[in-house]
């Protein structure tokens, strides 16, 4: 049984993330979506909110587990007995950082492989950062996120005082 880990902040989870989960879950026996605590990144959504959102969007995949983690990815990978780390590459600009991370992960976890996946064409330009910015400016994010995520974004932006004009 091959277990893979797909780590990220998922702030918020986008259609691009779901596309990668759908495709990776068809390759591996179990795919663990690791929602990183990442307080240093100052996430828009709390860890609990991001876990809830991920479970709402991904809960129908029978071989996908959504879990949070803090600390080093290597420890999360070991805890889940994973043999593969899945990472998405949207553009060449992602590659340099991801390549460095894959090298460090290989050093820390010599028996674990990193698998890069590119998004489907319609999702290549989507990022959580861009989606958050559009939502905070009152724009339509419905093509980039699922309806439940759009609702979360709308409510969060409203709680922060509404869209920035």
Swiss-Prot record:
One of its GO terms (biological process) is coenzyme A biosynthetic process. The keyword Repeat does not apply. Homohexamer. It is found in: Cytoplasm. Its EC number is 2.7.7.3. The gene is coaD. The keyword Nucleotidyltransferase applies. GO terms for cellular component: cytoplasm. This is Phosphopantetheine adenylyltransferase. The record marks 17 as: Transition state stabilizer.
